[in-house]
Amino acid sequence: MGQKTHPYGFRLGITKDWKSHWYAERSDYSSLLHEDWAIRNYIKKNYYQAGISLIEIERKAANRVDITIHTARPGMLIGRGGSEIENIRKNLVKLTNKSVFVNVQEVKNPELDAQLVAENIATQIEKRINYKRAMKQAINRALRAGAKGVKVMCSGRLNGAEIARSEWFREGRIPLQTLTADIDYGFAEAFTISGVIGVKVWIYKGDVPELHKEPIQELPEKAVPKKIEDEDLYEKDEVNYDVDA
């Protein structure tokens, strides 16, 4: 049975970039990785309603952490006069014991962000809205926003069924095996009375223009040995015979 590879990891280093930018020695790698997880978990858990799509972490020095939060509602993170963003920074300083700088960037088009679409569908399911209606509405909004293809899948005890199953809807193209395809992927969970329902969203936005590549210089053609005939092995001496009359 075929399985779907993660669209982000499949294109990592080709059309997608890393979410964490830092380098560490082997002895420090695990602690910094756990620190990244703790930072993302704190922000996502305490500000879930802010519509956070992506959290980028960069370490330019040993005691400095730069965090960029991509959100659909920057006002909820910044607060009145920047009070909320300062509160986030202070809590992260206590969590990491390092200097923390927080930057907030607004997501211009939330309908084309797969993570935000998945979280929106999960929230509607938790509010007892029919999952089919939530999925179809999300697909229509994404297509109107300019998406070339959308696929949404819900898995779990849908509508409280005794047996878990998966249902999905798709509109347009989703070329999962094309490395130059700009496919955004998001995953969210809806916690209901009957259990957890997983929501996956794929959004195809078009092809990414190929990166600039230097023209490959053509190698000189390989010399092909010429076939030597037997007649060429021995040169024939030309002899002139003078015949006296």
Curated annotation (Swiss-Prot):
Please state every residue range assigned to the domain named KH type-2.
39-108
Gene Ontology MF terms in the entry = mRNA binding; rRNA binding; structural constituent of ribosome
Cellular component terms, GO, for this chain's entry?
cytosolic small ribosomal subunit
Q: What role does this protein play?
A: Binds the lower part of the 30S subunit head. Binds mRNA in the 70S ribosome, positioning it for translation.
Lineage per the UniProt record = Bacteria, Pseudomonadati, Dictyoglomota, Dictyoglomia, Dictyoglomales
By its UniProt entry, which InterPro entries does this protein fall under?
KH_dom, KH_dom-like_a/b, KH_dom_type_2, KH_sf_prok-type, Ribosomal_S3_C_sf, Ribosomal_uS3_bac-typ, Ribosomal_uS3_C, Ribosomal_uS3_CS
Which protein, by its recorded name, is this? Small ribosomal subunit protein uS3
Which Gene3D superfamilies would you find in this protein's record? 3.30.300.20, Ribosomal protein S3, C-terminal domain
